[in-house]
């Protein structure tokens, strides 16, 4: 099996375990430092052995040695070997699934690793005249950039993937001061010979990406999500798909939004069995419309691009419709229009407040004029709901909201709320520029710009959104059910 070896040294401060794990993990008590016997040895880059009582020429604070297939597997390993400046040695064990964090001085499980490390062909074949600890024949002129990149990757991963306080990894607040000293590459050299790596910089943060194996969250994709702006990792439920590093708002599925807004156990879906029947027999050379529908249904688990139903929001009965951009771009076809229409009619009869969460690319072209007529149909029942029955409708615009949805029920709310940085427009930037042959000003179609021009009532982040909706409903005389009213 091919292995890569990483020799990492913390350059700032001694390793301390302060028990300051994030609330996302269980609480742990600090572990005391333990000392090993003097007969243990570590093998350095110049193939010299040092006992724990001896002083290493390159180990001033903490040495950490691990074996893995590549950097993504390295940061997913369970056990790490650490030695601090006082020559105290530790075996640090992480178990993400079981939420375990242990520090132990029994390194018997790692003996095989050290034997393998000492006999590594990469180390044994290293040039004897090379005394530069930073030297790497494959990285060459980019060696320090790659080192800084690896530092950034590991720092980002540990903070988000294991939720460790930043003080656990470094005592320095300067992001430019690296806590990793050196990075040794694979003995086969395949990693450097590959041309599938590139450096992408965003917000002064470098990220090393592989076109073959980029997603490091594969094993925990039900818990973690990767920012498509800065490529940082975050815990889905705690952060609500908002990147804690750059503040970027990631897309949420309709099911995630329902879970965010509706009280647990109160959601009652409507018209789940309604599916599109390809009413105009749309012909496409690339992929038939029915095949695209079937593929989207398998991918998302939905029957179409909207979920509708009733539930309780902080105890207040509401009618809710949530569009899902992952289903054919959230496009509005006959099924989407019919489900929203039925939801509004039900809310009218039951006198329920209405919430519609918009995320759509517009009308579905595969259904022709049938998709366009949904705009008028929904607007008509909304007129009866709002004007005749005097009921309360809140429209929530998320990124992106464009086309027919913007031109109809998206902008008809009694209160129109948008998420921060949401892209809201009728025609997209590319369409406008191609049609008018003029550049669209940057940010002119963002929620903040629309708020300044009076097209929105408020921009509300995801975290306080549920509370804001609850207050708005109570302001309009919709109150939580009493205990004896809950069926």
Swiss-Prot record:
A GO CC annotation recorded here is: chloroplast stroma
Co-factor: note: Binds 1 zinc ion per subunit.
**Signal peptide range:** none
GO-annotated molecular function:
acetyl-CoA carboxylase activity; ATP binding; carboxyl- or carbamoyltransferase activity; zinc ion binding
Task: Please provide the record's keywords in A-Z order.
Answer: ATP-binding, Chloroplast, Fatty acid biosynthesis, Fatty acid metabolism, Lipid biosynthesis, Lipid metabolism, Metal-binding, Nucleotide-binding, Plastid, Transferase, Zinc, Zinc-finger
Q: Where in the cell is it found?
A: Plastid, Chloroplast stroma
> Where exactly are the zinc fingers annotated as C4-type?
227-246
Record: residues binding Zn(2+): 227, 230, 243, 246
One GO biological process from the UniProt record?
Answer: malonyl-CoA biosynthetic process
State the Pfam families in the record.
Answer: Carboxyl_trans
| Similarity-based family | Belongs to the AccD/PCCB family.
Q: Which PANTHER family does the record cross-reference, listed alphabetically? A: ACETYL-COENZYME A CARBOXYLASE CARBOXYL TRANSFERASE SUBUNIT BETA, CHLOROPLASTIC (PTHR42995:SF5)
What does the subunit section of this Swiss-Prot or TrEMBL entry state?
Answer: Acetyl-CoA carboxylase is a heterohexamer composed of biotin carboxyl carrier protein, biotin carboxylase and 2 subunits each of ACCase subunit alpha and ACCase plastid-coded subunit beta (accD).
> Its function?
Component of the acetyl coenzyme A carboxylase (ACC) complex. Biotin carboxylase (BC) catalyzes the carboxylation of biotin on its carrier protein (BCCP) and then the CO(2) group is transferred by the transcarboxylase to acetyl-CoA to form malonyl-CoA.
The name of this protein is Acetyl-coenzyme A carboxylase carboxyl transferase subunit beta, chloroplastic
Lineage runs: Eukaryota, Viridiplantae, Streptophyta, Embryophyta, Tracheophyta
């Amino acid at each position: 099996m091919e292995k890569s070896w990483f020799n990492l040294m913390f350059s700032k401060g001694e390793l301390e375990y302060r028990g300051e794990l994030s609330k996302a993990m269980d609480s742990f008590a600090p572990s005391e430092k333990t000392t090993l016997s003097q007969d243990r040895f570590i093998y350095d880059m110049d193939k010299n052995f040092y006992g724990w009582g001896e002083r290493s020429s390159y180990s001033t604070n903490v040495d950490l040695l691990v074996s893995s297939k590549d950097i993504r597997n390295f940061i997913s390993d369970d056990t790490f070997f650490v030695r601090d400046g006082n020559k105290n040695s530790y075996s640090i064990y992480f178990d993400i699934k079981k939420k375990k964090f242990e520090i132990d001085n029994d390194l018997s499980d790692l003996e095989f690793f050290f034997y393998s490390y000492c006999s590594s062909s990469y180390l044994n074949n290293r040039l004897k005249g090379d005394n530069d600890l930073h030297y790497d024949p494959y990285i060459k002129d980019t060696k320090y950039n790659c080192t800084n990149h690896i530092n950034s990757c590991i720092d980002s991963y540990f903070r988000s993937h294991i939720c460790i306080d930043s003080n656990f990894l470094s005592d320095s607040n300067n992001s430019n001061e690296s806590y990793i000293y050196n990075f040794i590459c694979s003995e086969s050299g395949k990693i450097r010979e590959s041309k599938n790596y590139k450096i992408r910089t965003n917000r002064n943060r470098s990220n090393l990406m592989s076109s073959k194996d980029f997603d490091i969250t594969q094993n925990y994709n039900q818990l973690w999500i990767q920012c498509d702006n800065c490529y940082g990792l975050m815990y889905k439920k705690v952060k609500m798909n908002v990147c804690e590093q750059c503040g970027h708002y990631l897309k949420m599925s309709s099911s995630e939004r329902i879970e965010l807004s509706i009280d647990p156990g109160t959601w009652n879906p409507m018209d789940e069995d309604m599916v599109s029947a390809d009413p105009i027999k749309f012909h496409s050379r690339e992929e038939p419309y029915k095949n695209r529908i079937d593929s989207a249904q398998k991918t998302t688990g939905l029957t179409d691009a909207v979920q509708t139903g009733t539930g309780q929001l902080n105890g207040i009965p509401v009618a809710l419709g949530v569009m899902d951009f992952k289903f054919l771009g959230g496009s509005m076809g006959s099924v989407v229009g019919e489900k929203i229409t039925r939801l509004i009619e039900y809310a009218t009869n039951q006198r329920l407040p209405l919430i519609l969460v918009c995320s759509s690319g517009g009308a579905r072209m595969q259904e022709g004029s049938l998709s366009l007529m949904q705009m008028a149909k929904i607007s008509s029942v909304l007129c009866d709901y709002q004007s005749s029955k005097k009921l309360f409708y809140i429209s929530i615009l998320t990124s992106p909201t464009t086309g027919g949805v913007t031109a109809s029920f998206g902008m008809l709310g009694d209160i129109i709320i948008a998420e921060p940085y949401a892209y809201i427009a009728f025609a997209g930037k590319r369409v406008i520029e191609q049609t008018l042959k003029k550049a669209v000003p940057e940010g002119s179609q963002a929620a903040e710009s629309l708020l300044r021009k009076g097209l929105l009532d408020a921009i509300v982040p995801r975290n306080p959104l549920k509370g804001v909706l609850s207050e708005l409903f109570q302001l309009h005389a919709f109150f939580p059910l009493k205990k004896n009213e809950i069926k």
